[in-house]
């Protein structure tokens, strides 16, 4: 039992999901839903607890869906994320310098056009 909690705590610092995290999630939602069922019974069917039960059930379904989608995606570690960020930064710098060169060319062309139109008017 203690090993479960140790692995659960360690899984917090790892990317992705672990079996301990999934089990803890399901146990938490079952406890929440059982508590809401008991509150519905204890309050003779208070509508607010029905609403909370529905919201909790839909949230649990959404979390299950998200966990399944997350298991299909390849997660990147920090080194891969740094490499991708550096590539994006390098390409952005390169694009900015190309844009500045092109805008400099278009500015000089616009100046020549303005000078020509002034000389025609004179």
Swiss-Prot record:
Major place of residence: endoplasmic reticulum
Sequence segments annotated as region (Disordered): 82-122
Bias-annotated ranges (Polar residues): 104-122
Disulfide-bond pairs as recorded: none
Cytoplasmic-facing ranges: 1-20, 68-122
InterPro entries: Pkr1 (IPR013945)
Functional summary from the UniProt entry: Functions together with the other V-type ATPase assembly factors in the endoplasmic reticulum to efficiently assemble the V-type ATPase membrane sector V(0).
Family assignment from sequence similarity: Belongs to the PKR1 family.
Protein name, as recorded: V-type ATPase assembly factor PKR1
């Amino acid at each position: 039992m203690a090993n479960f909690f140790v692995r659960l705590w360690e899984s917090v610092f790892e990317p992705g999901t672990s079996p301990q995290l999934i089990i803890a999630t399901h146990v938490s939602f079952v406890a929440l839903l059982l508590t809401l069922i008991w509150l519905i019974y204890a309050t003779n069917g208070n509508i607010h607890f029905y609403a909370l039960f529905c919201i909790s059930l839909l949230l649990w379904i959404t979390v299950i869906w998200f966990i399944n989608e997350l298991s299909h995606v390849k997660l990147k570690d920090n080194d891969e994320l740094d490499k991708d960020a550096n590539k994006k930064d390098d390409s952005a710098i390169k694009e900015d310098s190309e844009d500045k060169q092109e805008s400099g060319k278009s500015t000089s062309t616009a100046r020549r056009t303005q000078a020509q139109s002034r000389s025609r008017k004179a």
